[in-house]
Amino acid sequence: YDYGMLGLDFGRLRAKYIHGFLESTENDINRYITARGIEWTNRKSLVIGLSETVIYSGEDRPLDIGYINPISTHLEIELNDRLNTLGTGSANAVWQISGDWLINQKLRISANYLFDEFVLDKIEFDNGKEHGKAYSGRISYTPIMSETTLLTTYFSLLTVGTPTFRHGNGYNNFVQRNKPLGWQYGSDGQEFKLGLNYFNRTNLIAQFEFGQRKTGEESITSRPYDPYADYLAGPFPSGIVEESLFITSKLQWWWRPSIQLNGGVDWDDNGS
């Protein structure tokens, strides 16, 4: 999609803002995306970030100047009626905290946690309502690091909740042209992976992954523009669950400085 971006770098502190146009649907609904984030680093081994991403839409809706201010937030804009449309159902926001920690030259940990819907009222919790959320984590270890070989192993986990990335107005879902924004399998799912990366530091890169994936019937990939049914807690993944084991491998080889050969294999058992 087309977007404009503003970035600021103050050394240990960095900030970034984007505003873009996602698409116009067949019934003249214009859809936009805007995001702002701030990141702190110790310039050695640690990066911590906070971000907010918003999708807003409306029939023949123009670019909303309420979101032009890079330091404004979705809740502040919406609750103070600064949008170019009435009400509080014309936009959908998610908030994310992330971290990346290089413990030493061989060990690295990264993680992300995303909120889509906050549930703060005890009554709502008692009625079975839950946060809309997603999270991921990765641990990588480099047992071989020499002048001729770089070998890294890793384990990763990713979970996206059942109603996450959906909205009461389906045109504010995190999708573009029927494809999810984010994890390619949408939502209502979980994935584990073990992987291996190899680089001979000259002309060969190889990657191998093995993992398991589970997706439920409420994934945003099946009904991209439908609103969520509710935020009530339930079995996860929901409904009929599709489970699969998968293996992927990729290879890049520079045979000559001007000739590169690429190859890959993707396999899964497509079980359910």
PLM feature spans:
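Internal, well-ordered domain-core segments that constitute the primary functional module
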Residues: Y1-G49
